[in-house]
Amino acid sequence: MGQTTIKSTALDFTAIKNNLKVFLSQQDEFTDYNFEASGLSSVLDVLAYNTHYNGLIANFALNESYLGTAQLRSSLVSLAEGIGYIPDSMNASQGIINLSLNLESLANRPTVVTLASGVKFDTVVDGTSYVFQTQEEISARDNGSGSYSFTTADNVADIKIFEGTSTTKTFNITAQTENAAYIIPDEKIDIDTAIVRSFETPSSTAFTTFTDLRKATSLTSTSTVYILKETPKGEYEITFGNKTVLGRSPVAGNKVTVEYLSVSGETANGAKVFTPQNTVTVNSQNFTLQVSTVSNSFGGSDKETIESIRTCLLYTSPSPRDQCL
């Protein structure tokens, strides 16, 4: 009795072709055929290549479905989503500085000078220019002689500045769809710097601030939280709750803004000198901020590597707020 099956799981092209020859030669319809002839040999080549490629695709697909064998970042990102683990994004490099202002020559000096978030500083690392900026409001009080030393809202004199470009992505919600995802086409987001706000209408000034799910301490049907995570394509998407799971979401007619830093990662580490981009205007006069570096820039990093994701997934419990320890 002739062979009725072909072993197509082998990935070796020659072995597949030989299996085809054996199979066909045992069929009554092909008993007198010369399978080494150029015509039949070419047909067998096509069949063998097709089987070979299908076998490779099947093996690749299976390998990419498992944590231990996946090789593509997109596969590991998808596996991470299944247990609620959010791979780390790029991280902004940060420096620490002291800021002061000398208004000794100014008449009618104000008691307090306040600077909004986003004060920018230029620096150079290994010949490449970077921009760092504050991420919170800072203020300084006259010491009685016209010298102002800036502190944070917590009265801390060491002020953190972060590398990156301030970016805002706006979404006008036209329809409320369950589990809707909004794409942010930027692979350089530092998700820790994101600020998410929802406005009642596109022209509203009042807003509700949503909290990163990783930082939420409790969840109810009315919680305002968001999830900002990497997609298999490498960009990012933001999702909200559905009034039952993970709280509520923006509704049709709302406007959602996502402010974040688009960063350079590790290459911005090591900056030593920070020069203010702009002067400070007080009583219609311009003054230059005085900067003292407390710490060279540090902490910038690229996206979490696939091997780190793999290791973290092995030791992370299935909770959206968990991160690798």
Name what the model sees in each region:
Residues 1-317, 321, 325:
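Signature of Asx- and small-polar-rich beta-strand/turn repeats characteristic
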